[in-house]
Amino acid sequence: MAPLRGAELVQTPLQLYRYLLRCCRQLPTKGIQEHYKHAVRQSFQVHSDEDNPERIQQIIRRAIEDADWIMNKYKKQN
């Protein structure tokens, strides 16, 4: 199960970025939200020069899986 509705519609890096920032807003505390927002921004800077479409899709899939894991982690703690 994806952390937010619309995960299946994410096709581009910009859509992924916006999706992940929306996921961050669902996290329980401001400190945790800021931590993951920073991680999202750093990941986008690291992968900004990626131009292989297959690799981009792989990164998108993995980022959504990671977001799902993080959302479930904090859901179980509360």
From Swiss-Prot:
InterPro entries, alphabetized: Complex1_LYR_dom, Complex1_LYR_LYRM9, Complex_I_LYR
Coiled coil segments of this chain: none
Matching Pfam families: Complex1_LYR
Family according to the record: Belongs to the complex I LYR family. LYRM9 subfamily.
Protein name: LYR motif-containing protein 9
Upper classification of the organism: Eukaryota, Metazoa, Chordata, Craniata, Vertebrata
